[in-house]
């Protein structure tokens, strides 16, 4: 019976820290979603899904494709306004950090052949065409004033603690203190990037 009360007390402590972290994690996700919408609409307008998700999915195997998550979480119905609301945090990770190219190999080859046929293939044009095949992530392309490597590291830590909180796992005082700082830093970076777009500093 004594052991039972000890376990019960520790469960209460873990629950306390989880409840304290949950609003901050929710705030992080909300601000992240706002930043992504803002950056994608600014760069791609209403075609942002075809310009990003479709190209990212090309790099992923069938079980990890983002559109599969969207279809499952939205009961088969989503649009440009609601798509991100159906993302899980792990989906955001794939969306932000998976590297993809703007054009397929077939497009690149066809473009080179067309330039060659029209006798306009020089070193500059060849370099320009090939550069379009370079793979870059959403974070690298569109998220302003944020170092991709640093943000990816912070994101992984938030994903880890988020899973512990959501699944009722042990959350200690050390977890709470460390991740409060991680989340605060991440939110600050996101807000700074949003401010760039709000002020049209791009």
Please identify what each model-predicted range represents.
Residues 1-160, 164-202:
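Amphipathic alpha-helical interface elements
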């Amino acid at each position: 019976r004594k052991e039972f009360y000890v376990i019960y007390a520790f469960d209460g402590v873990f629950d306390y820290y989880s409840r304290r972290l949950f609003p901050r994690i929710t705030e992080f996700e909300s601000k992240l979603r706002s930043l992504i919408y803002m950056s994608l609409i600014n760069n791609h307008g209403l075609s942002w899904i075809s310009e990003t998700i479709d190209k990212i999915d090309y790099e992923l195997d069938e079980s990890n494709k983002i559109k599969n998550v969207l279809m499952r979480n939205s009961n088969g119905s989503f649009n440009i306004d609601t798509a991100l609301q159906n993302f899980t945090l792990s989906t955001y990770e794939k969306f932000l950090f998976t590297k993809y190219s703007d054009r397929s190999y077939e497009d690149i080859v066809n473009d080179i052949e067309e330039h060659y046929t029209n006798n306009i293939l020089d070193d500059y044009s060849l370099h320009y065409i090939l550069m379009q095949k370079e793979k870059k992530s959403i974070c690298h392309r569109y998220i302003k004033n944020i170092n991709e490597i640093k943000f990816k590291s912070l994101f992984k830590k938030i994903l880890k603690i988020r899973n512990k909180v959501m699944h009722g796992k042990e959350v200690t005082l050390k977890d709470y203190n460390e991740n409060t700082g991680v989340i605060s830093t991440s939110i600050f970076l996101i807000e700074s990037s949003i401010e760039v777009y709000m002020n049209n500093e791009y």
